[in-house]
Structure formats: C-alpha cells, structure tokens
Amino acid sequence: MRPIWTGSISFGLVNIPVKMFSGVNPREGLDLDMLHKADHAPIRYARICRKDGEEVPWDDIVKGYEYREGDYVVLTQKDFDKANPRKTETVDITQFCDAPEIDLRYFEKPYYLEPVKGGDKAYGLLREALHESGKIAIVSFVIHEREHLGALVPLGRALILNQLRYPTDLRSGDNLKLPTTSDVTKRELEVALKLIKQETRPFIAEDYHDTYTEELEEIIKAKAKGHKLTVKSAKPHSTTPTDLMATLKASLSAKE
C-alpha cells in the first residue's frame, strides 16, 4: 500500500511520526460505460474551456475561488499548506471520550496509521494506553485540502483513524412524519422481541457480500448470449396494521 499522508500524531507534547494508509478497498462493482443510445458508441467526457471552447489537458488546470462574478483567485498547493502548517502535518488529539458517546451517523471512513522509523515506542504507548483505558481519542487533521474530525481507536496492533462527519454534514430528521409508540400493543412488542432474540447472533462481516452485483453479472452474461430474460416482480406488499400480529407470528414460525 502507498501512504496517502505523512505527518505525526500530537499526543500532549509528544509527536509520533506516522504514515496514513486508506483502510478501504475501492468498491468492486460492474464497470459500466455510458453509451450513445443510437449506435452504442462510448461517450467521452472532456474538460472544455468556457471561453475558447477548447479541450484543456490536466496539466493546464488549476484550482480557483470565485470571489466576485467572473473573477477568481488561483490557489496552489503552497497556499493550501500555508493555511495552517501545523494542521496539514499533524493528527491533533483534542480530547478523549467513551466510544458510545459518538453517534454512529458520524463515522465515515477508516484509515490505518503506521509508525515511521523512530516512532514505534510512542506509537505503542498510545495504543496500549487506549486499550487499557477503553477510551478513544478525538482528533482533527487536514487531508485533501479540508479539515476533518476523527476518532483514533486501537485495533489489535494498529491505530485506526476513523474520519468523522461534522454535525453540519448531517441532515435533521425533525420534519419527518414518524409514528409514536402509542399504537403498539404489549403483545405485539413481545412477539417482535422474540423475533429479534431468535435472529440475534454474532456479526461476522465475511458472511456478507454483494449478491446484487453477482446476479446482475448473470443477466449480462445471458444478454450477451442473446437470451431473453423474464423477471417476476418482487415488490414487497406492505403489512397492514390488522395483519401485523399474524405476520410476526408467521415470521417466528418460519425461522424455527
């Protein structure tokens, strides 16, 4: 793996040199191309200059901020680095807390942190301290020209930096029309709890994979051979309030 960032973890006055690696693989899906409907020729996207109508190569493209209509300030990598030199080079620990305090909606993307030569002992100390305390570290860091919030957690021998969303990144559900619990009977709740208990087991991520893509690949293979496919509608029927108890009981029986 190639590091996507090199800097240090700031733990009090201790600076731990680290490299950052992506903790996720690119999602493997079908590589679908955009085609012209008339002749099935691939569509090509181009970077066109609005002024002269010419295509612009990547080497001639820069980033800019429109501070007034039609007027731009061009920004270079040096400008991004100057904005806050410390934050561009540091994963700054701002506090510690218990993991359940963080709303699961905030978690966005994991990264691995690996100690650079000379940082092994301090890295190991922070990792063991987090293990022993049961706490996680809340951090701030800058990557891809943007400051992020993060949660630093130990996982085995590694330190994982989970990128977090800011509260302003989340939408409120206050305007949703949500039911109250007043219409739920005690008996319905008991049966629902039995179904949950019956389906409760340890979570093993390896048991899950993308079956939708696999089925879509089978459709593609069939169409490539000229086969016509007939697909039955699988739209689920909504359970009505009058059928709720009977359906819950049927679910219990089906799982036994």
Positions of predicted regions on the chain:
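Boundary segments of small protein-protein interaction reader/adaptor domains
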Residues: 1-256
